[in-house]
Amino acid sequence: MLCAIYRSPKRDQTYLYIEKKDDFSRVPAELLASFGKPQFAMLLSLNERKSLATADIEKVKSALVEQGFYLQVPPPPESLLKMHLGETKA
């Protein structure tokens, strides 16, 4: 299974995976509007991989088949205050 990966010019560390390069027909218009003009990053074969750096490969494959796309967003920022408070309680 091949997929094309695009980076968002509007949102840092946000990527859109689609089944076919430059075919955004299954991606909702609202998502594309908030994502910005997709910037091509790479073509990737998911069959030859067991994992991805920051996304669950099985979720990516499933979303591509069911929805035609997968949106990868960055993890939430760490709360340094919560970390500090947790350390002071211990």
UniProtKB/Swiss-Prot annotation:
**Alphabetized Gene3D superfamilies for the sequence:** YcgL domain
> Domain YcgL, which positions?
1-85
The name on file for this protein is YcgL domain-containing protein YE2368
Coiled-coil regions listed in the entry: none
Q: Return any one Pfam family short name.
A: YcgL
HAMAP family associated with the record: UPF0745
Disulfide linkage:
none
Query: What organism is listed for this UniProt entry?
Result: Yersinia enterocolitica serotype O:8 / biotype 1B (strain NCTC 13174 / 8081)
